[in-house]
Amino acid sequence: FLGNNELFLRKYPFVDCVFRGEGEEVFPQWLTCWNQPELWNDIAGLCYLNTDKQYRDNGTARVLNFSRLIPPEKSCFFNWDKPFVQLETTRGCFNTCAFCVSGGEKPIRTLSIENIRQRLQTIHEHGIKNIRVLDRTFNYNTHRAKELLQLFLEYPDIHFHLEIHPALLSEELKEELKQL
């Protein structure tokens, strides 16, 4: 949640709490004690008003085991009817841009190339033709970017949307992009 969490919670008393950060690990934790607010103190990223109406802020939740998360496309709720799929291969960003809410999210956490290959195969089997790669800066690491581009070449019928930082575009990577 972005914004003034305390103000939001006071303005909308029917909202019990909001999460700040990455919720994949902490939301299930909260579900085990959602009706016991006295147990919410140790849930990272949770912001709420306690029983005395005092604002509690448990900071920002971060998923440290990014590679262990269950891929969204394995969920029974995943919507395969869209013309595209979003694919996150990294989390975090090495930049600290003042205008960006993601800046300074360190460390950068990555999925293995094999993990991404398996996910691409699943996506391909569902007939998806467009993938939006959600990485903050696809080419932050030239070697990894090249590996991913080579992997993408294995799926010529899929279009990949990438966000590339022009200042980090090496000659080596430019040559790799020309092959696409």
What are these regions (language model features)?
Residues 1-59:
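Glycine-rich beta-alpha loop elements in corrinoid/cobalamin-binding modules
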Residues 60-66:
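A short, sequence-level motif marking secondary-structure junctions
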Residues 20-27, 62, 113-116, 145:
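A structural signal for well-ordered alpha-helical scaffolds and beta->alpha junctions
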Residues 50, 62, 77:
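A conserved amphipathic helix/loop scaffold
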Residues 67-180:
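Radical SAM [4Fe-4S] cluster-binding motif and immediate context
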